[in-house]
């Protein structure tokens, strides 16, 4: 399994690690010559027990235990009043994600660890 890490500080990418794939992705973002391409646009947590990985982002971003990360441009409609300027936008799906928010782990390899969220997800796990 290939592992890449996108480390964020505030809304801007601080570090992209993970070997060859991460280096290629970082070079792709740098090729736009736009700092906006290193800004977080959105994150979605996959909590749909019926979703499966199909190659269609509309379903893929909902796969249980995944996270979907958007980087770059955000329209003014989605982030009023001005949006987030960038030359492009890209999304990436991470399966079996581990997530920390403000130093607290809420997901570990796709399993919910936060007590409140775990109670909400009891039917699934």
Predicted segments, located by residue:
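Metal/cofactor-centered catalytic core regions of large enzymes
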Residues: 1-125
């Amino acid at each position: 399994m290939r592992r890449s890490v996108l480390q964020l500080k505030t809304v801007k990418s601080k570090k992209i690690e993970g070997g060859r794939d991460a280096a290629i992705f970082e070079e792709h973002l740098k090729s736009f010559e736009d700092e906006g391409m290193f800004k977080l646009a959105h994150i979605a947590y996959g909590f749909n027990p019926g979703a499966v990985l199909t190659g269609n982002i509309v379903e893929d971003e909902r796969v249980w235990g995944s996270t979907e990360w958007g980087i770059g441009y955000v329209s003014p409609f989605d982030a009023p009043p001005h949006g987030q300027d960038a030359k492009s936008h890209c999304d990436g799906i991470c399966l079996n994600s581990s997530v920390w928010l403000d130093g607290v782990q809420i997901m570990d390899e796709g399993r919910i660890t936060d007590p409140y969220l775990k109670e909400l997800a009891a039917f699934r796990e």
